Amino acid sequence: MQVKEGDIFECEGSFYQAIKATTKTATIRPIESTFEGLADAYGWEHKYMPLPNCFICDPIMGREASDNGKRLKIRDYSRAKNSPELELCGYRLTLWDGTPSICDTYN
């Protein structure tokens, strides 16, 4: 599966949108997300949905990379080669599947 411009990646409640993409790399920028509710009965896990094209500053990426985009190598460890991933400062960003992203606030 090839990453396209506009594709959204997620990691524990944070979302990133591809602003440029080639077969081997993707340039991403962080985007806003909205709180959708609680994902568990105890209130520790929160659900978030992305707001495409609403770019923000991300402290993990830094201000300059957030404004200009950060170019990352696309990796796909799946057998069927249909699950592209990006790695950002040790965090694994997965292609968003359309469901709310879960952020565990218990830590």
Segments (PLM) and residue ranges:
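Mixed-charge, low-complexity intrinsically disordered regions
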Residues: 1-15, 24-107
